[in-house]
Amino acid sequence: MAHKKGASSSRNGRDSNPQYLGVKKFGGEAVVAGNIIVRQRGTKFHAGKNVGVGKDHTLFALADGNVQFGVRRDRKVVDVVTE
């Protein structure tokens, strides 16, 4: 008989990193050009006036102003309203 038992292996021990998605600047909040407004997978929110889209569908401000959420043609849209 063997002196040592076979070393058991665990099937656990893996976990993916959090993605930190979601709305970063809410309606009415002031933003500076370049601020991230929404981090998302796919276009849950679409870009409106003064809002750009990154390659991972991140929405960001193109101008200084206030964030405004709305609906146009059954799409949720994010605008940056400048004074």
Swiss-Prot record:
Q: Where is the composition biased (Polar residues)?
A: 7-19
Look up the domain of life of the source.
Answer: Bacteria
Give the keywords, sorted. Answer: Ribonucleoprotein, Ribosomal protein
Residue ranges of region Disordered?
A: 1-20
Any one biological process term the GO annotation gives? translation
Q: Report a single Gene Ontology molecular function.
A: structural constituent of ribosome
- Which Pfam family is an annotated match for this chain, by its short name? Ribosomal_L27
Q: List, alphabetically, the GO terms of the cellular component aspect.
A: cytosolic large ribosomal subunit
To which protein family does this belong?
Belongs to the bacterial ribosomal protein bL27 family.
Output this protein's name.
Large ribosomal subunit protein bL27
